[in-house]
Swiss-Prot record:
Monomer. Transmembrane segments: none annotated. Belongs to the glycosyl hydrolase 13 family. Its cofactor is Ca(2+). Keywords: Calcium, Glycosidase, Hydrolase, Metal-binding. This is Cyclomaltodextrinase. Hydrolyzes cyclodextrins. Can also act on linear maltodextrins, with the exception of maltose. The active site is at 325 (nucleophile), 354 (proton donor). One of its GO terms (biological process) is carbohydrate metabolic process. Substrate binds at residues 243, 323, 420-421, 465, 469.
Amino acid sequence: MIKEAIFHKSDVPYAYPLNENQLKIVLRTAVFDVDRVYVLYKDRYDWLGKFKIKPMVLTHTNELFDYYETTLELNKKFVYFFYLVSDGGEKLYYTEAGFYKKRPENHFWGFFHYPYIGEKDVFFAPEWTSDCMVYQIFPERFNNGDKSNDPENVKPWGEKPTADSFFGGDLQGIIDKIDYLKDLGINAIYLTPIFLSHSTHKYDTTDYYTIDPHFGDTQKARELVQKCHDNGIKVIFDAVFNHCGYDFFAFQDVIKNGKKSKYWDWFNIYEWPIKTHPKPSYEAFADTVWRMPKLMTKNPEVQKYLLEVAEYWIKEVDIDGWRLDVANEIDHHFWRKFREVVKAAKPEAIIVGEVWHDASPWLRGDQFDSVMNYPFRNAVVDFFAKRKISASRFNTMITEQLMRHMDSVNRVMFNLIGSHDTERFLTLANGMVARMKLALVFQFTFVGIPYIYYGDEVGMVGDYDPDCRRCMIWEEEKQNKSIFNFYKKLISIRRENEELKYGSFCTLYAIGRVFAFKREYKGKSIIVVLNNSSKQEVIFLNEVEGKEDILKMKELKRSGNLLYLQPNSAYILK
């Protein structure tokens, strides 16, 4: 056995409570290296009792590792345990202290321990997220519902955008399209920032308590949220707490008064008088973006101000959560306080961080509920849009993502294929709709929350920002109805099948450009098969007999467990 690959730690994601009496544990081994794994466990203070023994199940395999899992049923809230690992010949006992050829006895402090399951150690996402499908709106480009609040020099709707061009999108425009959103089938919207700012994107906030007048006002925001709620749609606002805008009152006071300003310590000022060029004389977003001075969230006064903002909009207009911009550049201490404030104001509010990389430090149950899942997007773009990786590599990428987090976190990850900060998926796929449809099937059948960037559902294209922020296409003759109807079908399939919302995930086939997996829940299963190639493929899969394709994207020919897959095809077998 390759001992160097065998790994466990009594912490997330290798050990975590599902409730006060169940502990999920995971053991990693080298791929194809082990044939049996058992866990031996008992209550930590049951000095005379015997160890219980339980076999573990191989749940995930990738190019490097196998992962074995089980759930321990506990009589008490504390447990200690160790593993028995076998490759058919050699047997090893694996403990926190290392490996043993003989079963260790009287080894209390050498075993793996989960000392106590506290009530707050159990992570539960907001209940409504289990059936959630999110639609992101960039308000300035979604719909112009009130021309009376348009900015000066507004551009004609549909003209190609620049970094600073305005088109007049507003909150009334979103209200006017609630029926459209309801017809599509989504049940949550996330709005990029809507607070006072001079920019089109509003990520340089001037006033956190004022809706930008080109979008509307507080009453209009309240109306939007209420009408969304009336139609079964949750509303998530965007919080930009890493930095403010150059015109933010506190920064302007520093510009005017220097060290005499009571807000001096709200920022990290290198030199005064303030300079913006050639490089800002203060810490700013991305080091050089002078319009966005970084806020010092270690400062108790800054914390108090921002936490009051977060609470205010929940209470004032009844929003259902916050998406947190540049969340990975703010200290964890602040986010723990943020969670306490938000959950006290509205326990079912969702907290979603913007983290482009491994977000596990923020997803332990004490900070965020979810993040925008850019690693998911990376894998989907590479496999489906660009076709530059194999199914085996794709499986490794998504398996690694699943194994970073608790199951309850994976189920609420915002699985996006594009956003206001990325190229449109259809652009990356060189306009090949077939590739996009395959990606969508995976997105809507994988573990997590499907996330739609406005306009993707009608076939919008666009390169990197600002081109990805084009005006929404409302002329039906210009919309791709094939893509739109495909979205609607996938949304319906996901909503009607519990396996896709709650089920476990297991890869069944990952060879060449064919990928197949199973979602299973309460004894029922759905098998998804994706042929991400331009030629017919023939594969053998167990468990497919008796199952019918509910997607009906392309004809499926079969002979027992042999499947004849059409080029660029997907099948959802139930």
